[in-house]
UniProtKB/Swiss-Prot annotation:
Protein family according to the UniProt entry: Belongs to the SmpB family.
NCBIfam families: PRK05422.1, smpB
Name of this chain's protein: SsrA-binding protein
Keywords, ordered alphabetically: Cytoplasm, RNA-binding
Subcellular location: Cytoplasm
Gene3D superfamilies xref list: 2.40.280.10
Length: 155
């Protein structure tokens, strides 16, 4: 995560399971009033979200932000596509990399930084099934080692 980040609102844990994250970028979000209120309340889901580049702009799809409870008829659509704010050079770099086979733009987390909602966007390459199994075995081995050390210190 970039330096100086604030409170993490939501994380996409599935992205780290399904993809190798090669690079991360910080992007601003273009939101409506009721959307930022719902995000501050922690009512956002990144599980099935993905980003695409269209006409030189980056858009995030399937990011679910629940409707604001105190909102009225001006409440937002929970699944609308939202624009991400990045520098032109970053967009060009992402566009070139995303055209390569096997690469995707995946939202990793949403956090608040200096009062603004930001998204960590990852340039990711898909994992094969055997890669996922290998990662799970490594994770379990680390847990087992930590458990042994913890038990040894108690004695």
């Amino acid at each position: 995560m970039p330096k100086g980040t604030g409170k993490v609102i939501a994380q996409n844990k599935k992205a780290f399971h399904d993809y190798f994250i090669e690079e991360t970028y910080e992007a601003g979000l273009v939101l409506q009033g009721t959307e930022i209120k719902s995000i501050r309340a922690g009512r956002v889901n990144l599980k099935d979200a993905f980003a695409r580049i269209h006409n030189g702009e980056v858009w995030v799809h399937n990011m679910h932000i629940n409707t604001y409870e105190q909102g009225n008829r001006f409440n937002h659509d929970p699944l609308r596509t939202r624009k991400l704010l990045l520098h032109k050079k970053e967009i060009d770099k992402l566009a070139g990399a995303a055209k390569e086979t096997g690469y995707a733009l995946v939202p990793l987390r949403i956090y608040l930084k200096n009062g603004f909602a930001k998204m960590a966007l990852g340039l990711a390459k898909g994992k094969k099934q055997y890669d996922k199994r290998h990662d799970l075995k490594e994770k379990e081995a680390k847990r087992e080692i930590a458990r042994v050390f913890r038990d040894r210190q108690k004695m």
